[in-house]
UniProtKB/Swiss-Prot annotation:
Protein name, per record: Phosphoribosyl-AMP cyclohydrolase
UniProt lineage: Archaea, Methanobacteriati, Methanobacteriota, Stenosarchaea group, Methanomicrobia
Entry binding sites for Mg(2+): 75, 77, 79
Free-text remark on how the cofactor is bound: Binds 1 Mg(2+) ion per subunit. Binds 1 zinc ion per subunit.
Location of this chain's protein in the cell: Cytoplasm
GO MF annotation list: magnesium ion binding; phosphoribosyl-AMP cyclohydrolase activity; zinc ion binding
Chief place of localization: cytoplasm
Chain positions recorded as Zn(2+) binding sites: 76, 92, 99
SUPFAM superfamilies: HisI-like
GO BP, one annotated term: L-histidine biosynthetic process
Biological source species: Methanosarcina mazei (strain ATCC BAA-159 / DSM 3647 / Goe1 / Go1 / JCM 11833 / OCM 88) (Methanosarcina frisia)
UniProt entry tagged with the keyword Zinc: yes
Key words, A-Z: Amino-acid biosynthesis, Cytoplasm, Histidine biosynthesis, Hydrolase, Magnesium, Metal-binding, Zinc
Length: 120
């Protein structure tokens, strides 16, 4: 196993890209610190670092829309990680399956899977 201390963090953080293992759809990206990576490996559930709240958070902690991590890959520069997951519910807090639900023109192209006001 790669030593998480050897990853190239910037200000203690590394980008975590989340992809649905089955469909290959990119679901989201978020920052992770070493603790988030370790907790993700330990529990099998995606954990991230919230820059706004300055704390560790488990994806789906409030909504129940967990990301069950099936595999973690490290990129060639060792400065980002890819989490291949089984997504439970939507990944986006706006109610969409993916955070990448709009194209450059602002057109909604993603699938809405829940109403945020019913969850948060």
């Amino acid at each position: 196993m790669i030593d998480f201390g050897n990853l190239k963090y910037e200000n203690g953080l590394i980008i975590g890209i989340v992809q649905d293992r089955a469909s290959k759809e990119v679901l989201m990206c978020a920052y992770m610190n070493r603790e988030a990576l370790e907790k993700t490996v330990e529990t099998g559930i995606a954990h991230f670092w919230s820059r706004s709240r300055q704390k560790l958070w488990k994806k789906g902690e409030t909504s129940g829309h967990l990301q069950k991590v099936k595999e973690i890959r490290i990129d060639c520069d060792m400065d980002s990680v890819l989490l291949l997951v089984e997504q439970v519910g939507g990944a986006c807090h706006m109610g969409y399956r993916s955070c990448f639900y709009r194209n450059l023109d602002g057109e909604v192209v993603g699938e809405k899977v829940f109403e945020p006001e019913d969850v948060y």
